[in-house]
Amino acid sequence: MEVREKKDEKMEMTRRKSSALDHHRLPPYTYSQTANKEKPTTKRNGSDPDPDPDLDTNPISISHAPRSYARPQTTSPGKARYRECQKNHAASSGGHVVDGCGEFMSSGEEGTVESLLCAACDCHRSFHRKEIDGLFVVNFNSFGHSQRPLGSRHVSPIMMSFGGGGGCAAESSTEDLNKFHQSFSGYGVDQFHHYQPKKRFRTKFNEEQKEKMMEFAEKIGWRMTKLEDDEVNRFCREIKVKRQVFKVWMHNNKQAAKKKDL
């Protein structure tokens, strides 16, 4: 009897201990949730085989706009024109004398050495004022290669006149510098008197040639175009005048003829 009672007491104590342990133990699902929350969220090598569904693991993509290395388009430069000649023929003596040529006229075909020389004034194209679609371009070559000596008197530019304008003269020529010398004789400037203009061959025209050239120039509008090359060449052979000489004559007489029409 006593042995049985002790056995029952022992079983009762074991049952109570087991009940006490079950009271302090957490439920299975609660433990698993707590364990998942305590897992570290750091990723290795940018990947995680079992990501936490509660956390937003979608990567943020940042895209850069493609960089363009193409050069910006620029407007093509306009056609260059060469206007009045600005060569200083008295630069070596400290004066300022221009020849009065109003526009560059090529002496030869494009691509040749003669194409860079003006048929009217025989100066290089670089001495003429360059103009691109109305823009003024400063040409430093036109101011001469020598500087004005210190202490010299300021001299206003003098223009050498071209003959043959208006059909009054019988030839297309450049006047000498007599007026230039006379204008400075009163100031005692003797250093300019040694300047001598270079001699150029001048073509003389008779009255019949001048009349025919005037009529033909008005017919073609005082300009030569490629469409009229054959007609111009035939006319020049007829009056026995070179094509380039006729071109220079039109250049020198164009403005005077237009003034007469007005």
From Swiss-Prot:
A zinc finger (ZF-HD dimerization-type) spans 82-131. One of its GO terms (cellular component) is nucleus. Residues 198-261 bind DNA. SUPFAM superfamilies: Homeodomain-like. The keyword Cytoplasm does not apply. Pfam families: ZF-HD_dimer. Residues 1-93 are annotated as: Disordered. Gene3D superfamilies: Homeodomain-like (1.10.10.60). The record marks M250 as: Required for DNA-binding. It is found in: Nucleus. Putative transcription factor. This is Zinc-finger homeodomain protein 6. It comes from Arabidopsis thaliana (Mouse-ear cress). The lineage of its organism: Eukaryota, Viridiplantae, Streptophyta, Embryophyta, Tracheophyta. The gene is ZHD6.
